[in-house]
């Protein structure tokens, strides 16, 4: 069956309420027959249009608006009104709309979320619901949920503790699960766990929609998380994917290690960021013509993103034949207190793994001059951290320096694409976390900065995991994903400065990632969906969400003529 063909869908809804159901509403695309039989004739203008015209109308309204925040609100209103049309709009130009529904605009939306809140798009579960989380989950109208994105709002992008306002992240993330990965949106559930906030402005804001007290921590917090994980898995199944998003460093690794072997879970800030960064590095190596194990990598930042990338680089270097110990020696990290070295005070267990025998240093410029890295990766959300001197030094040490400014949003980027290319005279191999415009150099070349967006990773991973019912998600999934992404980058893309496939191909990239995950899952006996499909690509494709409107008219058909004869008299 062609997955693009209209699907027949049964509903008891009729009349006005049907037009208020975003899963069923077609707006002006309802045919005359549908309008009459579904009792909505007269509620809509007489004009009947197809979805293509509807998309054009949305884009026209979108382009009339002056701010990205207003554009975000327009798209969120559309999602609340007509789900199929919303995703059709996103998929019509992913490169244009992704920065609005996700980074960088979603950061501004989260800061304004208390003002922008209009209707429920997910579940808010507070610490005071402890002991009753299963009951709160019952409030969600969908019985089948295969993917959850959950946050506690403590570390939203590079913006810090936004508490309940962080709900914009799970909502935006799951929108990309569907637009980029084809995961059914009705099977996705955004959740915010509200345990309070340390944000003074929010605590004093009378319009703040969350709990107005300090964050609950320690054993009570852990018991709350344990209950949530147990309740969600009990209700939706042990194969329900639970993605952790924007938890603070002190909890992110701890919770991942605690739950990864019991539930189907991953942390996108750690593992997703790692995968997309390593994908960029693998693509960059096709330019430098050497191996990953030949690199010396310096991180500005030592939080969950940096450590996640570092661990995946080690795994990739091991695959090239290097020992774990030697691989770790090629990785250096700088945190807020300076270079991470052995004997330095207050090192966490995760940071200790990458501590070197070296003198203590604090100044990043001096550290770069001393270490002479071949690759410099920024994930500390310190805007402008890669100074002109650092960029000059990187270009002096390397013919083709690898410079990744991965912090979000744009204001937190370590340097801009233009700064990087101009200082290095176009020799830098650059990638960023937020989008930057193409840069034209004095010699006439135009370079297109690669955007190392996690959206290349998590939609495909989610699609693959959900499709085959993968029970646990290990780190090899993310190395495999990085390899698949890098393989989609053509030589022409590399010449243009792109380290990632064009965003308009992201749905195809996600399909390839998902198919590889499904293949490996069955090969390693980790899948739970049986019988095993013979054609894995066809199997995954058949499960991808279609934006074509469903057929919701009653299933009408005829009987044979002889049985339809009207009896007019009783036989004696």
Curated annotation (Swiss-Prot):
Per UniProt, the cofactor note for this protein states:
Divalent metal cations. Prefers magnesium or manganese.
Organism classification:
Eukaryota, Metazoa, Chordata, Craniata, Vertebrata
| Residue numbers marked as site, Important for activity | 269
The residues the entry assigns to the signal sequence are none
Q: Which UniProt keywords apply?
A: Acetylation, Cytoplasm, Metal-binding, NADP, Oxidoreductase, Phosphoprotein
UniProt source species = Rattus norvegicus (Rat)
Q: How does it assemble?
A: Homotetramer.
Task: Tell me which family the UniProt entry assigns to this protein.
Answer: Belongs to the malic enzymes family.
Identification of the protein by name: NADP-dependent malic enzyme
Where the protein is mainly located, per its record? cytoplasm
Q: PTM Phosphoserine: at which residues?
A: 336
Task: Name its co-factor(s).
Answer: Mg(2+); Mn(2+)
Give the UniProt record's GO annotations in the biological process aspect: malate metabolic process; NADH metabolic process; NADP metabolic process; protein homotetramerization; pyruvate metabolic process; regulation of NADP metabolic process; response to hormone
By its UniProt entry, which CDD domains does this protein fall under? NAD_bind_1_malic_enz
Catalysed reactions listed for this entry: (S)-malate + NADP(+) = pyruvate + CO2 + NADPH; oxaloacetate + H(+) = pyruvate + CO2
Q: Which NCBIfam families match?
A: PRK13529.1
**Residue positions, PTM N-acetylmethionine:** 1
Q: Which GO terms describe its molecular function?
A: identical protein binding; magnesium ion binding; malate dehydrogenase (decarboxylating) (NADP+) activity; malic enzyme activity; manganese ion binding; NAD binding; NADP binding; oxaloacetate decarboxylase activity
Question: Per its UniProt entry, which superkingdom is the organism in?
Answer: Eukaryota
Q: Where does NADP(+) bind?
A: 155, 269, 301-318, 408
Protein task: Catalyzes the oxidative decarboxylation of (S)-malate in the presence of NADP(+) and divalent metal ions, and decarboxylation of oxaloacetate.
Location(s), subcellular: Cytoplasm
Which residues catalyse the reaction? 102, 173
Q: What is its EC number?
A: 1.1.1.40
């Amino acid at each position: 069956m062609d997955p693009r063909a209209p699907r027949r869908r049964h509903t008891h809804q009729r009349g006005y309420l049907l037009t208020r159901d975003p899963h069923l509403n077609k707006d002006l695309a309802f045919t005359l027959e549908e309008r009459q039989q579904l009792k909505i004739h007269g509620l809509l203008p007489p004009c009947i249009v197809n979805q293509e015209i509807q998309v054009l109308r949305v884009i026209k309204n979108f382009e009339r608006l002056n701010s990205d925040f207003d554009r975000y609100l327009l798209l969120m209103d559309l999602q609340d009104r007509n789900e199929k049309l919303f995703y059709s709009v996103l998929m019509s130009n992913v490169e244009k709309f992704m920065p609005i529904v996700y980074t960088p605009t979603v950061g501004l939306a989260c800061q304004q979320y208390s003002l922008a809140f209009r209707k429920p798009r997910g579940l808010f579960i507070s610490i005071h619901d402890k002991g009753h989380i299963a009951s709160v989950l019952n409030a969600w109208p969908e019985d089948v949920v295969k993917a959850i994105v959950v946050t506690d709002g403590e570390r939203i992008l590079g913006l810090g503790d936004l508490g309940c306002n962080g709900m914009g992240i799970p909502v935006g993330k799951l929108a990309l699960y569907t637009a980029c990965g084809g995961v059914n949106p009705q099977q996705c559930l955004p959740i915010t766990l509200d345990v309070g906030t340390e944000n003074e402005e929010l605590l004093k804001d009378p319009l703040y929609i969350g709990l107005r007290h300090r964050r609950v921590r320690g054993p009570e917090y852990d018991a709350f998380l344990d209950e949530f994980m147990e309740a969600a898995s009990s209700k939706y199944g042990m194969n329900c994917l639970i993605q952790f998003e924007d938890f603070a460093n002190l909890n992110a690794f701890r919770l991942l290690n605690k739950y990864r072997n019991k539930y189907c879970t991953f942390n996108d800030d750690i593992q997703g960021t790692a995968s997309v960064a390593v994908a960029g590095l693998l693509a960059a190596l096709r330019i430098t013509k050497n191996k990953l194990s030949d690199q010396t990598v310096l991180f500005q930042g030592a939080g969950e993103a940096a450590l996640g990338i570092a661990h995946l680089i080690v795994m990739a270097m091991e695959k090239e034949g290097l020992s774990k110990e030697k691989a770790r020696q090629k990785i250096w990290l700088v945190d807020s207190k300076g270079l991470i070295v052995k004997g330095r005070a207050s090192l966490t267990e995760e940071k200790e793994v990458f501590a070197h025998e070296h003198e203590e240093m604090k100044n990043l410029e001096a550290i770069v001059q001393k270490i002479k890295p071949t690759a410099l990766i920024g994930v500390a959300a310190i805007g402008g951290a890669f100074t002109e001197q650092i960029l000059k030094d990187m270009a002096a040490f390397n013919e083709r320096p690898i410079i990744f400014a991965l912090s979000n949003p744009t204001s937190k980027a370590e340097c801009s694409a233009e700064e990087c290319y101009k200082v290095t005279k176009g020799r830098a191999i650059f990638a960023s976390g937020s989008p930057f415009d193409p840069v034209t150099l004095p010699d006439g070349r135009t370079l297109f900065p690669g955007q190392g967006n996690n959206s290349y990773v998590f939609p495909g991973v989610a699609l693959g995991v959900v499709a085959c019912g993968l029970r646990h998600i290990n780190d090899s999934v993310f190395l495999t994903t990085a390899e698949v992404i890098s393989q989609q980058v053509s030589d022409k893309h590399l010449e243009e400065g792109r380290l990632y496939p064009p965003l308009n191909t992201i749905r195809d990239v996600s399909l390839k990632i998902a198919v590889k995950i499904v293949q490996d899952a069955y090969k390693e006996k980790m899948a739970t969906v049986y019988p095993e499909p013979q054609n894995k690509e066809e199997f995954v494709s058949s499960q991808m969400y279609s934006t074509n409107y469903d057929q919701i008219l009653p299933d009408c058909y005829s009987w044979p003529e002889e049985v339809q004869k009207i009896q007019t008299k009783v036989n004696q």
